[in-house]
Design a protein with these regions (language model features):
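Hydrophobic/small/kink-forming positions within alpha-helical transmembrane segments
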Residues: 10, 14, 18, 45, ...
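Helix-helix packing/entry segments at the starts of transmembrane helices
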Residues: 31-38, 86-105
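Juxtamembrane helix-loop-helix junctions in multi-pass membrane proteins
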Residues: 15-39, 57
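C-terminal transmembrane-helix exit sites in multi-pass transporters
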Residues: 103-122
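Structural signal for membrane-spanning alpha-helices in multi-pass inner-membrane proteins
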Residues: 20, 44-51, 82, 109, ...
Length: 137
């Protein structure tokens, strides 16, 4: 079932690129990121409330909170740079570069989480990087 969620994530990420490119025309990208963040904030808290997630907030550990905050900072910085790149570049070039994050995540998961680097993951990461380079050059 994870693949269905991943596929939906990919679909919405693709829509994000298109909607963002149209929405940031003539707009300060920092303001655009702030607006996007407010929408996500309301949506995420609404989902957490209606699905009962808020009732488990007391189970969060200090480590959970620290790393969720670090993840939020990384996400925010990613969005800021992504919107700026979309404002001045083509979606067909910006999106593939952004998706190189998959290859970077594989490497970081190996370094920090001890996830194995198999021939399959190395070849897949190199194909992602190669495909991205083909699309942008």
């Amino acid at each position: 079932m994870w693949w269905a969620y991943a596929l939906l994530s990919a679909l919405f990420a693709a829509l994000t690129a298109i909607f963002a490119k149209i929405g940031i025309k003539g707009v300060d990208t920092d303001l655009a990121t702030a607006i996007r963040t407010v929408v996500i904030l309301v949506l995420a808290w609404g989902i957490a409330f209606f699905r009962g997630g808020l009732f488990t907030i007391h189970t969060l550990t200090k480590q959970n909170i620290v790393f969720l905050c670090l993840s939020g900072i990384a996400t925010g910085l990613s969005w800021i740079f992504y919107f700026k790149a979309l404002q001045i570049g083509k979606v067909s070039q910006v999106a593939p570069v952004d998706k190189m994050s998959v290859a970077i995540a594989i490497l970081l998961a190996f370094i920090f989480l001890g996830e194995p680097l198999t021939v399959k993951t190395i070849v897949g990461a190199l194909m992602i990087i190669g495909g991205s380079l083909v699309l942008i050059l």
